[in-house]
Curated annotation (Swiss-Prot):
Alphabetized InterPro entries for the sequence: DUF2371_TMEM200
Keyword RNA-binding included in the entry's annotation: no
Protein name: Transmembrane protein 200A
Pfam families: DUF2371
Transmembrane segments: 62-82, 127-147
């Protein structure tokens, strides 16, 4: 038992030692932290300035405050008179006489001394003194409360003004930041616009290359001289006058082929911004190859075998001036006087006999110019990489760079535009019958030329009629040459 008791006491001592060591470790571990934290004592915070309103004594509440103080002072004085201590007097004759004399003197002294003599040690003062003192204290407390409430209202108003001022300042700062950001964005936009101003130069070069393709030129060379550029611009203007004003102003400028007629003078005026065509034409031919766009449902006239064989010879022997000058119909300027219709229109129902010779010269060039739009001729002439010249052959109306006699429109199609063209579709068995005659196919007898001033609408009508008559008679001329006595069906 003694041994077991000794073992238990030893274990208890060991546990105490372990607990003491653990406590020492616990006490020692925060010591370095406290030692480290002692030099890093935080400085006392600066006193927070509390903004408060003023206590305005020059107010009704201030008046009542002063009144309460005075009433309480009067009450205190009344209580003092009532509770003032008394002294014991011995009654003697001498003293009585003396007292009587003194009373007479006091009566002669004044009202205040007599009031004190009467109310001193009186019960009224003992009762009214504390009552008046309480009334004065009550008035004082109420006036003080009202004064502090007014001060709190002023402090609230001051805080609200501070809040409003901070909000307004933040708003103005945000507006300034937004203005600065907008200014930077506008500056970036201005830089981009200045950078984009150089793009019309490339579009002009593309327009010259397109004009070279669609203008029936036999070579791909483009001279970099100023005279060639001006010639290309005048040709594009003359072709643009054939279009309606809406198409020439909006649609053509969107494609970027040539600038609108109104802006051509501006482009001439800015002659300082000339572009070098040698270095960009080769890249523009490959970069500006637009896909073939079909603007209307009009199909290209399919050439016959004989006409296909004659295309190469006609293209080699044809000159550029004859093909362009005989077919282009220029629009006279508004500043100049109107010229007679003989020099303006190649074919019209209201012109003189001199037009017939001009029409013959233009029709003599018809087969080559009409067959230039055929797929076979286009493939032989331009190859597979250049598809821009086909833009002029896929439109039934006046296209971008098309000659006046590129497409044929029949009289039946003019009368009935909704009829299907079976001879141009996949049904190859149907062909037109030329044996029958139609009064619409006959040429009208030309009238005598009359010099007359026409309006703009009449000029546009004359141009459209001349274009329709020229294409119709061109088709008639081709059909008469290709007729081989076969039976044809006509719708």
């Amino acid at each position: 038992m003694i041994a077991t008791g000794g073992v238990i006491t030893g274990l208890a001592a060991l546990k105490r030692q372990d607990s003491a060591r653990s406590q020492q470790h616990i006490n020692l571990s925060p010591l370095p932290a406290t030692q480290d934290q002692k030099p890093v004592r935080r400085r006392p915070r600066a006193d927070v300035v509390v903004v408060r309103g003023k206590i305005r004594l020059y107010s009704p509440s201030g008046f009542f405050l002063i009144l309460g103080v005075l009433v309480s002072i009067i009450g205190i004085a009344m209580a003092v008179l009532g509770y003032w201590p008394q002294k014991e007097h011995f009654i003697d004759a001498e003293t009585t006489l003396s007292t009587n004399e003194t009373q007479v003197v006091r009566n002669q002294g004044g009202v205040v001394v007599r009031f004190f003599e009467q109310h001193l040690h009186s019960d009224k003062m003992k009762m009214l003194g504390p009552f008046t003192m309480g009334i004065g204290i009550f008035i004082f407390i109420c006036a003080n409360a009202i004064l502090h409430e007014n001060r709190d209202k002023e402090t609230k108003i001051i805080h609200m003004r501070d809040i409003y001022s901070t909000v307004i300042d933040i708003h103005t700062l945000r507006l300034k930041e937004q203005k600065q950001a907008n200014g930077l964005y506008a500056g970036l936009l201005g830089d981009t616009e200045v950078k984009q101003n150089g793009s019309p130069c490339a579009s002009r070069l593309a327009a010259t290359t397109l004009a070279s393709f669609s203008g029936m030129r036999n070579s791909f060379r483009v001279d970099s001289s100023v005279e060639e550029d001006e010639l290309m611009l005048t040709e594009s203007k003359s072709l643009g006058h054939l279009m309606p004003p809406l198409l020439s102003d909006s649609a053509v400028s969107v494609f970027g082929l040539y600038p609108p007629p109104a802006k051509a003078t501006d482009d001439k005026a800015s002659s300082s911004k000339k572009c070098d065509t040698k270095s960009i034409v080769s890249s523009s031919i490959s970069a500006f190859t637009l896909p073939v766009i079909k603007l209307n449902n009009c199909v290209i006239d399919e050439p016959s075998i004989d006409s296909i064989t004659e295309v190469a010879d006609n293209l080699k022997t044809r000159s550029r001036n004859l093909s362009m000058d005989s077919l282009v119909v220029p629009l006279p300027s508004s500043g100049e006087s109107f010229q007679p219709a003989v020099t303006l229109l190649p074919r019209n129902n209201s012109v003189g006999e001199s037009l017939s010779s001009q029409y013959k010269s233009s029709v003599a060039l018809g087969p080559g110019t009409g067959q230039l739009l055929s797929p076979g001729a286009a493939r032989r002439q331009f190859g597979s990489n250049t598809s821009l010249h086909l833009l002029s052959s896929h439109s039934k109306s006046l296209d971008l760079d098309r000659g006046p006699s590129t497409l044929t429109v029949h009289a039946e199609q003019r009368k009935h535009p909704s009829w299907p063209r079976l001879d141009r579709s996949n049904s190859k068995g149907y062909m037109r019958l030329e044996n029958k005659e139609d009064p619409m196919d006959r040429l009208l007898v030309p009238q005598t030329a009359i010099k007359k001033d026409f309006t703009n609408k009449e000029k546009l009508l004359m141009i459209s009629r001349s274009h329709n008559n020229l294409s119709f008679e061109h088709d008639e001329f081709l059909s008469n040459n290709l007729k081989r006595g076969t039976s044809e069906t006509r719708f």
